[in-house]
Structure formats: structure tokens, C-alpha cells
């Protein structure tokens, strides 16, 4: 049985017409699923009982089972722990801004990259999410909170470009006007840097935003923070980003988690400005999550100094305003606690 959320618009039309239903029925089904958040064919009352029975024979509509939810008392940021059909768990986060609601979603169960400051990597890698499981995070959050998500960041558990096909297909579904209907420039992919996939992304014709999780200005330091750097060097990654920018014309966000005594030195700021010179970038400076054992945040003074050095060297930069600090909103924390409690 196929999960309807795995299907593109064109695939759904083909599937239902092959079953003998009219093409326009696809739009009716999608209205129920994406607009009304209905995942039961029996509730689709503008379809005949015969059609509903036929659809139930061939398709499921797999929303996610909510295991846990944490809501920030500070800013309303909401973190969800979901159970998948095979018993694995993933996390998603809903962030509230005055003018929009942003969802941070996962692409893998666990993560193979194992950045030292990330809780997701501590629990290991299990598998890629299906297209439907990625899409279902948006629908399940919207159904749970009864709110419409306007922005999506692929910054949750996992490395999106290591689950490339399912990530790209989910973006097309979320962007399609008869499905997720989320503007393409309101969707961001965050990656630690998979050079060939960054170049491939430039060829997709998808005008999504790209964020690169860099975290260090030299290979020596990045090897320690992001083990995958031993496979793909900073030079290879930035070269791929330059190709991406030539093809798309888009500015790229550079994510930089600052850790006291590791990558927050004045020399690091100067080196970062040097390697990013003449690139169309914006640097997001992120104090390390204090819940990660053994890692400490830089002082406020050091954060401001780091930012000032970048600005003085012509690199746009900002210190990210944190959300959900009281609920450890960074993805991976809830899942890791659940795994530890069962071991």
C-alpha cells in the first residue's frame, strides 16, 4: 500500500486515473489532506463511498504519532517528538515570529555526520526518512497546533543532502500550490557541505535558500568539530558553493556555532573573513548550546568582537537570537533522552 504523502502531484493524478477516478479527484483529495489535515478517506465526504473504499484499498495517509511535546514559556517555541510506523523517533520544532511561523524539520533518523556539539549525532544514524515522513512533519504540526506554517528550514535531525532524492521531492510537494503551497524562497536547506550535491542542487531549478554549517575557518579545526570534513575539505565545499552561486545568483547563509576556546579566537574571525571574501554570504553566529556536555559559550564580549571583525572585513554577520532555550529546542535532545531512559 502506498503512502499518499510520498507522491508528487503528477504521480497522484496518474495513480487515481489508473484506478478509474477522474483527474479532478486528485485536487479534492489534496484539499482534504493539505488544507483540512484529514488523513482518513472516510471523512472525505465529497467522494462517493465507492471511491473512498477504492482509495482505502490502495493508499494510506500516514501522519505522525505524537509521543511528546515541549512548549517554551519564553516565546512559545514548540518541540515535537514523533513516532514513525517502524517505531523509530524523530523531532520537529515550530518557531513563532510576529509575521510568520517557521518549522524546523528532520530528514533522517539520527545523523551520520556526528558534529560534536549536536545531540542528534550522539544517538547514531539509523536510516533516511521517506518523502512522506518529511512532509508528514509539516502536516502533523499544523494539525496539532491548528496553525499554518509559512516557512520551512531543513535544519532538524540529519543531513538533508545525504537523503537527497527524498529531500528534493519533499520540497517540491511542500512548494506545490495544490499541496503544501509554501513559497520556494521560504524554504531553506541546511547542510554541512556535500560538494557534489550542492552543485546538483544548483541544477534542480529550485530557488530554495541554502545554509552552510561551516563552524570553523580551517580544516584542522573543522576536522575536530565536523568529522565529515576529513572527507570534504573546506576548499572543496566553498568551491561548490561558488559554483552554486554562479548558477543561482543566491546569497548563502554561513552557520557558525561559536565554542569557547575552540573556534572563537580573533584569529578565527580574521581567517573566516578571509576565506569568505568576495562571496555573497551572510554569517549567522550561534553560541553553542549550553546543554552539550563539556562545551562552553564565548562571553558576550567575545561574540561581539567576533561579529565586529567580520563586519570590518566586509562580511555581513549577526548573532542569532535564540528561541526555546528553556526547552532545549535544538533537535535531538528529546530523542536522546528517550533513548538513554530505555537503555
UniProtKB/Swiss-Prot annotation:
The lineage of its organism: Bacteria, Thermotogati, Thermotogota, Thermotogae, Thermotogales. It comes from Thermotoga maritima (strain ATCC 43589 / DSM 3109 / JCM 10099 / NBRC 100826 / MSB8). Its EC number is 2.1.1.192. PROSITE patterns: RADICAL_SAM. This is Probable dual-specificity RNA methyltransferase RlmN. Specifically methylates position 2 of adenine 2503 in 23S rRNA and position 2 of adenine 37 in tRNAs. Its cofactor is [4Fe-4S] cluster. It is found in: Cytoplasm. One of its GO terms (molecular function) is tRNA binding. It holds the Pfam family Radical_SAM. It catalyses: adenosine(2503) in 23S rRNA + 2 reduced [2Fe-2S]-[ferredoxin] + 2 S-adenosyl-L-methionine = 2-methyladenosine(2503) in 23S rRNA + 5'-deoxyadenosine + L-methionine + 2 oxidized [2Fe-2S]-[ferredoxin] + S-adenosyl-L-homocysteine; adenosine(37) in tRNA + 2 reduced [2Fe-2S]-[ferredoxin] + 2 S-adenosyl-L-methionine = 2-methyladenosine(37) in tRNA + 5'-deoxyadenosine + L-methionine + 2 oxidized [2Fe-2S]-[ferredoxin] + S-adenosyl-L-homocysteine. GO terms for biological process: rRNA base methylation; tRNA methylation. Reaction proceeds by a ping-pong mechanism involving intermediate methylation of a conserved cysteine residue. The active site is at 91 (proton acceptor), 331 (s-methylcysteine intermediate). InterPro entries: Aldolase_TIM (IPR013785), Elp3/MiaA/NifB-like_rSAM (IPR006638), Methyltransferase_A (IPR040072), RlmN_N (IPR048641), RNA_MTrfase_RlmN (IPR027492), rRNA_lsu_MTrfase_RlmN/Cfr (IPR004383), rSAM (IPR007197). SMART domains: Elp3. Keywords: 4Fe-4S, Cytoplasm, Disulfide bond, Iron, Iron-sulfur, Metal-binding, Methyltransferase, rRNA processing, S-adenosyl-L-methionine, Transferase, tRNA processing. [4Fe-4S] cluster binds at residues 111, 115, 118. S-adenosyl-L-methionine binds at residues 158-159, 190, 213-215, 289. GO terms for cellular component: cytoplasm.
